[in-house]
Amino acid sequence: MQKLINSVQNYAWGSKTALTDLYGIANPNNLPMAELWMGAHPKSSSKIEDASGQVRSLRNVIDADKATLLGDKVASRFGELPFLFKVLCADQPLSIQVHPNKKASEMGFAKENAAGIPLDAAERNYKDPNHKPELVFALTPFLAMNAFREFSEIISLLQPVAGANNAIAHFLENPNAAGLSQLFASLLNMQGEEKSHALAVLKAALDSQHGEPWDTIRLISEFYPDDSGLFSPLLLNVVKLNPGEAMFLFAETPHAYLQGVALEVMANSDNVLRAGLTPKYIDIPELVANVKFEAKPADHLLTQPVKQGAELDFPIPVDDFAFSLHDLSPAETAIAQESAAILFCVEGEATLHKGGERLVLKPGESAFVAANESPVSVSGTGRLARVFNKL
């Protein structure tokens, strides 16, 4: 049971103020602070201070005794802490992304290795053989896009821009999965005059269209005025999460985070296929091969939590991680799991007890609890978020 020393990722889209305003994390160099990472990811592992005062990488500590710290089931199934926990602070839209499923990730990783493509190459799609399921939990109002709209909605929204590109007219005549696939690829493939014309038609439509998703297109255009991803809000659900709402992001489903602060939990993977709103490499054939061109109604996208006493559990369809929130009270309650856990103080103050040990977490602080330390007692005020495994 040890407090974590976590790193901040200074990606350009991050907020310069959110982590300071919410959690008092200093920003002396006035850099964008996009993500606070909690976990043992090789790119940027959290650290802990041991009894002798020595600071050590959490990844190295776990590697030295996986079965004890992770639990036998997690150690044998994953061989590492299988999740990464983040506070994500988006001031600007992130790229539209698709994550391949587990089988496609394994095959793509092996294929690119066999082709001799370096892991750090710009054209590399698969950085590891794992899938990347994600859950996002809003701390502030959080704007995102997730999954294709109902086809009837797409048809209606495309009417004002029907003249932007032949693929739009074709989809309106053939509104099915094959037509959507062709439209998606055609918009990404646009170059030169074709792209200029399409974006001009879209921007002209903004003069007469109001509300959503046109407001989201206006927002994105402030940052990406010449990106064909500006058409995406017409195809994808625009989702506004209120604080306390959560959403699971499935494999093979386009999504993008646009603005706001959220907790994000994901499997340990860097496999991302980009699909717009980015200057980075887009492998369009690989992307289209890894997208399910099926509609998901917007009202089905939120993850409905299950309340069990003071715990709010968010059920998800994978075992790479589990996520729950705990309302704290002065009376101690036990938190137990057969895996390691990362506990994060969302608000208030949390006190953790185990044997003679006592650890206090203030907002924005987190702790690592090893599997062999379960259960721990918690008390305090406010809320505690827990990421762990149910195996």
Residue ranges and their predicted role:
Residues 1-209, 279-297, 323:
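Transition-metal
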Residues 38-40, 87-91, 98, 133-141, ...:
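Short, conserved beta-strand element in jelly-roll/cupin
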Residues 48-49, 58-74, 147-148, 226-242, ...:
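A short beta-strand-loop-beta hairpin characteristic of the jelly-roll/cupin
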Residues 92, 349-391:
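Generic C-terminus detector
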Residues 261-313:
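C-terminal, non-catalytic macromolecule-binding modules
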Residues 94, 135-144, 260-279, 321, ...:
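A short hydrophobic beta-strand segment most commonly corresponding to one strand
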Residues 88, 236-249, 253-258, 263, ...:
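Short acidic-glycine-tyrosine-enriched beta hairpin
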Residues 307-310, 319-337:
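Conserved short histidine dyad/triad with adjacent acidic residue
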